[in-house]
UniProtKB/Swiss-Prot annotation:
Converts 2-succinylbenzoate (OSB) to 2-succinylbenzoyl-CoA (OSB-CoA). Pathway: Quinol/quinone metabolism; 1,4-dihydroxy-2-naphthoate biosynthesis; 1,4-dihydroxy-2-naphthoate from chorismate: step 5/7; Quinol/quinone metabolism; menaquinone biosynthesis. SUPFAM superfamilies: Acetyl-CoA synthetase-like. Transmembrane segments: none annotated. HAMAP family: MenE. The gene is menE. It comes from Staphylococcus aureus (strain MSSA476). Keywords: ATP-binding, Ligase, Menaquinone biosynthesis, Nucleotide-binding. It is an enzyme of class 6 (ligase). GO terms for biological process: menaquinone biosynthetic process. One of its GO terms (molecular function) is ATP binding. This is 2-succinylbenzoate--CoA ligase.
Length: 492
């Protein structure tokens, strides 16, 4: 199959691919810049690299350049601690990291995009698009000179089953999982999203979710597959986002529930040109749904995972009006079912489809991931008689705070290393701003202050993973067989 960017440059070349409000690149511009950079990246002779990047045009050029150079990209969450980053990259044998942000990480070759000279001036697209020319630099006048050189021609096609990206589902002190996402996975996800949500070449999608998350990267894949425009924003600011929505004819936007709430507080009381507001990353409250629908905002609730290359369940405004607790129905190209439902119809959600990963890169010895071709999500769900899916527990122990997945095991492991703590458990605590925040229960015979615990945990965990609430207890609730009863700790 032809690279999607190559195809768009040929067929949709003058359409705006990406803009940050100051600078815009057509699909031809984007392909040209990515091709130039790809040739530079080939010199590093790496088949897999880490990316430490922001939401910027340069980061998007870098992503496409890696793919044109047949390099797999491992996305690094920029909020992680250095040790967390090291452990993730080492687990998948990454030695080199390209970055668009300052980074110091011992034991790795760090290459800033600013240090790679690749930007051209006035280069014709003809040679690139018919794949007959190489690009070389004439250092005497700092211009780019097309030159026939078949030995260094970039591939314009790719294998759908090659790995495109790698993302991690959790931190690294606890059980981490490296998810390989193939081009086929991304393509199937994009097609499913198009059918269940809807977009076309006239779409103008505002993307503010981090590119290192599947929710951010998936927007870029949908764009290059379909040929629409992405308005990239690096940081969320409600006033700025609302201004962009009003003034730049934004048709689509991806948000987590709290950011939608902030936008409504800022004055998003009508849809303007918005056709679709795609929500995910945390449960929607009934109040948020009611308020948004009163403003006639086109909200679409969704559910997806890193392992499924973003959403595979989508709820339309009509569905949310009928059942506010639903995450909707599955995309047409996936199949879902409930494993071992109880008398209430609740059981583990299983999914099968081309959007689902083939298996984890790390650890390699996991069992029970798939059953008869269905991926075991670990989420407790129900499918009602109309086909609506309700998610009751997102992997039960998982804490979802502001769209970030936090695994209690990682926090507990670090906490138990604190002098004087004999046992600890972390659960999600309700929070008006973030949905949930971590709360740590610990057993100790010593007097340990909250400040001491925060200082210690902050040395080992990313800031958003550090518990916001602490409670000292005499014992933790275990069953007679030694199983921790976390449900007894879920209280306000």
């Amino acid at each position: 199959m032809d690279f999607w960017l190559y195809k768009q440059a040929q067929q949709n070349g003058h359409h705006i691919a990406i803009t940050d409000g100051q600078e815009s690149y057509t699909y031809q511009n984007l392909y040209c810049e990515a091709s130039l950079l790809a040739k530079r990246l080939k010199a590093y002779q790496q088949s897999r690299v880490g990316l430490y990047i922001d939401n910027s045009i340069q980061s998007i050029i870098l992503i496409h350049a890696c793919w044109l150079a047949n390099i797999e990209i491992a996305m690094i969450n920029t909020r992680l601690t250095p040790n967390e980053m090291k452990n993730q990259m080492r687990s998948i044998d990454v030695q080199l990291i390209f970055c668009t942000l300052p980074l110091e990480l011992r034991g790795f070759q760090i290459v800033s995009l600013d240090d790679i000279e690749f930007a051209g001036t006035d280069i014709t697209m003809n040679g690139l698009l018919d794949n007959t020319m190489d690009i070389q630099y004439d250092t005497s006048n700092e211009t780019v000179v097309p030159k026939e050189s078949p030995s260094n021609i970039l591939n314009t096609s790719f294998n759908l089953d090659d790995i495109a990206s790698i993302m991690f589902t959790s931190g690294t002190t606890g059980p981490q999982k490296a998810v390989p996402q193939t081009f086929r996975n991304h393509y199937a996800s994009a097609i499913g999203c198009k059918e269940s949500l809807g977009f076309d070449r006239d779409t103008n999608w505002l993307s503010v979710l981090p590119i290192y998350h599947i929710s951010g990267l998936s927007v870029l894949l949908r764009a290059v597959i379909e040929g629409f425009t992405v308005r990239i924003v690096d940081k969320f600011n409600a006033e700025q986002i609302l201004t962009i929505i009003k003034n730049e004819r934004i048709t689509h936007i991806s948000l987590v529930p709290q950011t939608l709430n902030w936008l409504m507080q800022q004055g998003l009381h009508e849809p303007y040109n918005l056709q679709k507001i795609l929500l995910g990353g945390a449960k929607l409250s009934a109040t948020l749904i009611e308020t948004a629908l009163q403003y006639n905002l086109p909200i679409y609730n969704s559910f997806g995972m890193t392992e499924t290359c973003s959403q595979f369940l989508t709820a339309t405004p009509e569905m949310l009006h009928a059942r506010p607790d639903t995450v909707g129905m599955p995309s047409a190209n996936v199949d879902v079912k409930i494993k071992n439902p109880n008398k209430e119809g609740h059981g583990e959600l299983m999914i099968k489809g081309a959007n689902v990963m083939n298996g984890y890169l790390y650890p390699t010895d996991l069992t029970g991931t798939f059953e008869n071709g269905y991926f075991n999500t670990g989420d407790i769900a129900e499918i009602d008689h109309e086909g609506y899916v309700m998610i009751y527990d997102r992997r039960k122990d998982l804490i979802i705070s502001g769209g970030e997945n936090i695994y209690p095991y990682q926090i507990e492991t670090v906490a138990k290393q604190f002098p004087g703590i004999s046992d600890a458990v972390c659960v999600g605590h309700p929070d008006d701003t973030w949905g949930q925040v971590p709360k740590l229960y610990f057993v100790s015979e010593s007097d340990i202050s909250k400040a001491q615990l925060i200082a210690y945990l902050s040395q080992h965990l990313a800031k958003y993973k550090v518990p916001k609430h602490f409670e000292k207890v005499d014992t933790l609730p275990y069953t007679s067989t030694g199983k921790l009863q976390r449900n007894k700790l879920y209280r306000g």
